[in-house]
């Protein structure tokens, strides 16, 4: 019996952020009917931290995003064409000065980008992709926010 990996398996690497503004609100995006955190796939020649900052800035129309620290990694699989994609996403705590206006990257299917009060993040994380709860908990462990 052949134990080689299936030719229909695609392995992807991505990075994203739990981004706080000066009001300690968290940046969330609404994409394909779900709340999500900004993230995206690693491009050739860039580091994982560079990818995280680039994706946050591109998806939300920001500049000057500061990477603070690594938070966690999440892994999930999903169908992609006639294959199965397994994506590892590297998450980072990030900060941005002020409370900048956001411009969602509509070409990526992002309909909204919003600063969400931290008190509402636990609810949001519980209504969307299960891996986002892991990111939320890692952010709280890192001291990114205080939850009552």
Where would I find each of the regions flagged by the language model?
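Unchanged
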Residues: 42-129
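Short, acidic, Ser/Thr-enriched surface-loop or helix-capping motifs
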Residues: 21
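Charged phosphate-binding loop/patch that engages nucleotide di/tri-phosphates or the phosphate backbone
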Residues: 126-148
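C-terminal lobe/hinge of AMP-binding adenylation domains
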Residues: 31-32
């Amino acid at each position: 019996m052949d134990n080689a990996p299936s030719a229909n398996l695609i392995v992807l690497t991505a990075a994203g952020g739990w981004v706080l503004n000066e009001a300690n609100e968290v940046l969330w995006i609404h994409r394909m009917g779900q709340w999500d955190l900004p993230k995206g796939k690693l491009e050739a020649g860039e580091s994982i931290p560079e990818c995280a900052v680039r994706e946050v800035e591109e998806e939300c129309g920001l500049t000057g995003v500061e990477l603070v620290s690594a938070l966690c990694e999440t892994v999930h699989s999903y169908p992609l064409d006639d294959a199965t994609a397994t994506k590892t996403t590297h998450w980072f705590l990030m900060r941005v000065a002020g409370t900048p206006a956001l411009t969602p990257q509509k070409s990526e299917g992002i309909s909204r980008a919003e600063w969400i009060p931290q008190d509402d993040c636990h609810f949001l994380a519980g209504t969307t992709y299960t891996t986002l709860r892991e990111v939320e908990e890692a952010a709280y462990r890192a001291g990114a926010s205080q939850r009552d």
